[in-house]
């Protein structure tokens, strides 16, 4: 269905993962907890749900609402969305900025007009202090409360889950986490911003 890249394309840079110090794992009758000095992830044994706590500021930026689902439609994650929470990212989503209450496609529609997706990126960030990047080129859909208010539903046409969750309070910090994985974008010289491209927005 999709052409194969030769050599295979990669999302991650070669030195994507930072060393993490002070990782601890503990367990009780109800939960398995993985923590670092800055972040705590709590997995509920019975339900399979999890939440992520930011130990730096005592907040819970991320909470799952259902187990990870694997089916014929791919892999799906479902998170809680708050009333005062906003979502950004997904690459070039023409005509869209904040995705709250909307659904976006993570697939190249080769459409440069309003509603098109010209250069998708499997990454978004939330004003609650977290970001998610899927390590896949497969098509995806991210629903930020269009079908059901208060719920974020993320899906990719993939038969496994490979995603990074970043926890940081400020957008710049979350973007730096993203760049740690993918590499920093290149700043073009002034002559690279050619005037002819302006016709795409008339």
What are these regions (language model features)?
Residues 202:
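Short, acidic/polar
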Residues 1-192, 196-198:
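N-terminal accessory segment at the very beginning of proteins
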């Amino acid at each position: 269905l999709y052409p194969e890249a030769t050599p295979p394309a990669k999302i991650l840079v070669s030195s994507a993962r930072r060393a993490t110090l002070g990782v601890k794992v503990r367990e009780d009758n109800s939960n398995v907890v993985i923590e670092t000095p800055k972040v705590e992830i709590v997995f509920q044994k019975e339900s399979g749900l999890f939440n992520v706590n930011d130990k730096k500021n005592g907040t819970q930026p991320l909470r799952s609402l259902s187990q990870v689902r694997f089916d014929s439609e791919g892999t799906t994650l479902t998170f809680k969305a708050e009333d005062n929470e906003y979502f950004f990212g997904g690459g070039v989503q023409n005509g869209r900025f904040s995705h709250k209450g909307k659904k976006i496609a993570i697939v190249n529609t080769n459409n440069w007009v309003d509603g098109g997706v010209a250069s998708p990126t499997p990454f978004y960030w939330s004003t609650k202090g977290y970001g998610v990047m899927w390590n896949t080129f497969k098509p995806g859909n991210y629903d930020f409360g269009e079908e059901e208010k208060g719920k974020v539903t993320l899906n990719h046409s993939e038969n496994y889950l490979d995603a990074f969750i970043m926890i940081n309070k400020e957008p710049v910090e979350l973007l730096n986490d993203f760049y740690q994985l993918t590499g920093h974008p290149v700043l073009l010289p002034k002559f690279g911003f050619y005037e002819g491209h302006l016709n795409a927005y008339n």
